[in-house]
């Protein structure tokens, strides 16, 4: 098996995602990763349900998923790529920067959000990604994000 094969992910269900990321309900924003191109790109999935706690107050009569949670889903999808590539238990992926964030359409209960994440560049433990969130192929949000890999004992 090649080094590339041992440090990249082909797809991931929720169990694998929870091994890669420290997030848990209600803040785990990725249910599944369906497509991965090594450490270059991935598509994460979030199935949006009315039972999620943020819908209690955002907004009770017309529930809309907060945009910041769409950004978090993008960051978690990118974080799974970073965590798997680094391949060392005990590392954390910290969300560092957000640029060019745009929210195009509301996301509501019943939607299936796809987080399309593409690596823009990597230098050492710093990663940069361009991310799009889509529902039924339509762009609902986009952003450029930065992440840093940090050893858990140094966090």
Swiss-Prot record:
Signal peptide coordinates: none
Q: Which reaction does it catalyse?
A: a (3R)-hydroxyacyl-[ACP] = a (2E)-enoyl-[ACP] + H2O
Q: Which cysteines share a disulfide bond? A: none
Highest taxon listed in the record's lineage: Bacteria
Location comes to:
Cytoplasm
* InterPro entries tied to this protein: FabA_FabZ, FabZ, HotDog_dom_sf
Q: Which is a Pfam family this sequence falls into?
A: FabA
The biological processes this protein is annotated with in GO are: fatty acid biosynthetic process; lipid A biosynthetic process
Molecular functions (GO terms): (3R)-hydroxyacyl-[acyl-carrier-protein] dehydratase activity
Please give the CDD domains that the UniProt record associates with this protein.
FabZ (cd01288)
Q: What is its EC number?
A: 4.2.1.59
Q: Which Gene Ontology cellular-component terms appear in the entry?
A: cytoplasm; membrane
Main EC class of this protein?
lyase
Q: Give the chief site where it resides.
A: cytoplasm
> What are the record keywords, sorted?
Cytoplasm, Lipid A biosynthesis, Lipid biosynthesis, Lipid metabolism, Lyase
| Keyword flag NADP | no
Active site located where? 58
> What protein family does this chain belong to?
Belongs to the thioester dehydratase family. FabZ subfamily.
Q: What does this protein do?
A: Involved in unsaturated fatty acids biosynthesis. Catalyzes the dehydration of short chain beta-hydroxyacyl-ACPs and long chain saturated and unsaturated beta-hydroxyacyl-ACPs.
What name goes with this protein? 3-hydroxyacyl-[acyl-carrier-protein] dehydratase FabZ
What gene name is given for the protein in this entry? fabZ
